[in-house]
């Protein structure tokens, strides 16, 4: 099975789950993240603003935006441009119907990068949505925990 077929299969499987099930699974996953040593020790964390079929990060972002330096991606052309989330940050709908922070680009370091994915294997390898945004971004930050 190639990546395109796997994405199609997973999309079909996701449709079998309710919104409530997704929220329950999201809370479980994000609770594990909150307690993970890499997150606990991190000062600067890149997260993502979730799409409806992804682990729901919206409440998580609100909970942590004033406790850690939270960075969110914005998409400009073919690239991810990281932006720091602050108390005053406004959001706008981006190219893919994703809420994106409206702020200056962040050019600092990261302690942890959390990325969305269509699927992950036991070794942490991921399949994204096929556009390569995170692949290109992560290649520039190989030293950062993910």
Question: Language-model features: where?
Answer:
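Redox-cofactor binding/interface segments in oxidoreductases and associated redox assembly factors
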Residues: 47, 115-116
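Charged helix-capping and loop-helix junction motifs
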Residues: 129-134
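Short loop segments at secondary-structure junctions
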Residues: 86-88, 118, 141-143
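Glycine-rich nucleotide phosphate-binding loop and flanking beta-alpha elements
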Residues: 53, 120-122
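N-terminal active-site beta-alpha-beta segment that forms phosphate/nucleotide-binding
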Residues: 1-100, 104-108
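Surface-exposed, charge/polar-rich loops and edge strands
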Residues: 1-5, 12, 104-113, 122-125, ...
């Amino acid at each position: 099975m190639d990546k395109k077929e796997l994405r199609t299969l997973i999309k079909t499987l996701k449709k079998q789950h309710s919104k409530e099930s997704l929220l329950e699974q999201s809370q479980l996953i994000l609770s594990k993240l909150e307690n993970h040593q890499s997150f606990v020790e991190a000062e600067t964390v890149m997260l993502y603003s979730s799409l409806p079929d992804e682990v729901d990060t919206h409440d998580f972002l609100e909970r942590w935006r004033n406790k850690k330096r939270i960075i969110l991606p914005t998409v400009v052309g073919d690239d991810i441009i990281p932006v720091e989330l602050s108390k005053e940050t406004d959001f706008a709908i981006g190219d893919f119907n994703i809420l994106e922070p409206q702020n200056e680009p962040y050019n600092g370091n990261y302690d942890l990068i959390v990325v969305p994915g269509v699927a992950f294997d036991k070794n942490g390898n991921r399949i994204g949505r096929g556009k390569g945004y995170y692949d290109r971004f992560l290649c520039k930050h190989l030293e950062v925990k993910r």
